[in-house]
Amino acid sequence: MKRHKICKIIFAILAVFLCVAFYELIGICITYKKQPAVSDATIKETQNIMSVAGRENTERAVIIEKNSQALLERVRLIQNAKDEIILSTFAFKSDESGKLILGALHDAADRGVHVRILVDGMESWIDMEGNPYFYGLSSHENVEIKLYNKANPLKPWKTMGRMHDKYLIADGKIYILGGRNTYNYFLGDFPGHKNFDRDVLVVCDEPQKDNSVNQLLDYFETIWEQEDCRYFHNSKKLADRQSVKKAVLELQEGYQQYFEVNKEKICDKDYADETEKITLLSNPIHTQAKEPVVWYQLGELMKNAKERVKIHTPYIICNDMMYNTWEEIAQKVPDFSIMTNSVANNGNPFGAADYAKNRNRILETGIDIWEYEGGYSYHGKSILIDDDLSVIGSFNMDMRSTYLDTELMLVIRSKEVNKQLEDGMMEYESVSRQVLDDGTYYDPYHVKPIELTEKHKRKVFLVQHLLGWARDLF
């Protein structure tokens, strides 16, 4: 009798789980399976993306390649801010680099600087809820933290709409934008796993209305006021908790130690190159399936190249529309290539599985594929066009970035910045091999490929056969 009762309870729990899973699946599929087309308004707007006209551009830019430099530059911006700091990030963890950023932000707030932080609501549920380090910051009188589209299992029709933006703005004059999240994988040089990525730092001493820094500020204000952005634990009473007091003290002491060691590097300096024009590209900010605005705009930029287009992306997950775009570019541009992680080097099982299955389809577009074999997963999202255009940001060459996430890409017209980007790209390409049409490799750099382990093979196999139907959601 007792055993029968236990079986009934287990069956009831399983039935509830399956009902919830079915509810979530139906809600997600109904909302996100239909992929919107490009509108006439986007087509018209795109025609003016990179026309160089009007007043002389006052913005300067420099690319940030190394993770250690990426942490230092963020601390430098925060430390030198006098009025306002804006931070938007997909993921924010309280590991070593995350605590340094938290400590720097807390120090700025103590100086009277107004701090606003926006974090994606799915990642924050994992990393920030119940975390005294974040409560110590959110309860500060000069700090506001909001979450974009907070995770809610009762609303599956909003589940897949995520905020993938990553940028930091100081005093409305200087900002960092790129593909790096706010934790050890991307910032600093701490032991353990790493992801290699790329940012660009932009400086504008006297911002004009049409400068990119104002484009980014306008974008932030719009998404900050969006109805799906809600405050994160802003009660001042949180500061009275012993666990929060202890966490704040740890942040303050840790940041002061880092500051003392790096004081000379953190002092304000000017080393950015002049630019002709910088333009911000952005996806819609709502949580539903999105018009592929950034994809279309990037495609038009690449189609207008005269000599070369070089893409770097961690993942390639395309539909027919995206493949067709690449086919058009390949027909128009003599030198068209892409570098991505090899199957063995890709830390994302969904990206690895889809690439393994569709590599030949990618080759059929006419694009040259280079596979990165550096050991740590490559996360950079950049495009090099001819000798004067550079595109850097958060956009992956996949359907999630195209149709589901908010995304930002910065288009910079500058031969000096273009050369910086080319040098950075080639450093990674020197650890890559070109895939040939027959499946063999051209290996001019004598690269030793990463071993595809049995464990990784099993992951790829399972994703391909169990989740391949949902490739547009990952």
Each PLM stretch: what is its role?
Residues 146:
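Phosphate-binding P-loop/Walker A region and its immediate neighborhood
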